């Protein structure tokens, strides 16, 4: 998709205008920046992790970046092209609450089976704790919960049928009925 081209092809640009929340001008700017950072037109996992490390210098962002990468890489080819990047960015930055919930669920559902287990949830929550670093986490995590305690609290609120897994429907219903759950999922990063 437009690899090594300095401009998006008109049909690609039109497609992205239709399928993202970005304007034509914004897409052109994002594409220019993407090519500056990724001259090959694609990001591999290592490059993606380096971007996260720049944004989270006080912790270890590598594990969380690995999960985000998996969620961005829609076709599963081990790289992120501009389309995958901008579509994910559109959802996470400007998408509807529903779109963001779907994206978050996809990230937490590590094996893609449509259910989040306690272990999957714990892996993501631990990755978030490591990413932001100890000092920042202590400031953000005013309730003092460990990753395991946070998972237990989330499951108590979300796992309606008490089968130790969360379906997309349970995930959405709980998040809509109790917005504080979304903060738990983010480890209160929005405070």
From Swiss-Prot:
Residues 24-59, 60-95, 96-131, 146-181 form the EF-hand domain. Ca(2+) 2 binds at residues 109, 111, 113, 115, 120. Transmembrane segments: none annotated. SMART domains: EFh. Ca(2+) 3 binds at residues 159, 161, 163, 165, 170. A lipid is attached at residue 2 (N-myristoyl glycine). GO terms for biological process: regulation of signal transduction; response to heat. Keywords: Calcium, Lipoprotein, Metal-binding, Myristate, Repeat. It holds the Pfam family EF-hand_7. Neuron-specific in the central and peripheral nervous system. One of its GO terms (molecular function) is calcium ion binding. CDD domains: EFh (cd00051). Ca(2+) 1 binds at residues 73, 75, 77, 79, 84. Probably binds two or three calcium ions. Belongs to the recoverin family. May be involved in the calcium-dependent regulation of rhodopsin phosphorylation. This is Hippocalcin-like protein 4. It comes from Rattus norvegicus (Rat). The lineage of its organism: Eukaryota, Metazoa, Chordata, Craniata, Vertebrata.
């Amino acid at each position: 998709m437009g690899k090594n081209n300095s401009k998006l092809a008109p049909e690609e640009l039109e497609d992205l205008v239709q399928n993202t929340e970005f304007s034509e001008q914004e897409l052109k700017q994002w594409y220019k920046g993407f090519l500056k950072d990724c001259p090959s037109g694609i990001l591999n996992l290592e490059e993606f992790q380096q971007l996260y490390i720049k944004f989270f210098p006080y912790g270890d962002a590598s594990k969380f970046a690995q999960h985000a990468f998996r969620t961005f890489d829609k076709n599963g080819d081990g790289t992120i092209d501009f389309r995958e990047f901008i579509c994910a960015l559109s959802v996470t930055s400007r998408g509807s609450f529903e779109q963001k919930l779907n994206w978050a669920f996809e990230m937490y559902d590590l094996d893609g089976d449509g259910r989040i287990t306690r272990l999957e949830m714990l892996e993501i929550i631990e990755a978030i704790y490591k990413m932001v670093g100890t000092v920042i986490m202590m400031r953000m995590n005013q309730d003092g919960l460990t990753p395991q305690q946070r998972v237990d609290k989330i499951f108590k609120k979300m796992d309606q049928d008490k089968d130790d897994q969360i379906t997309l429907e349970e995930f959405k219903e709980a998040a809509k009925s109790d917005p504080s759950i979304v903060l738990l999922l983010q480890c209160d990063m929005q405070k």
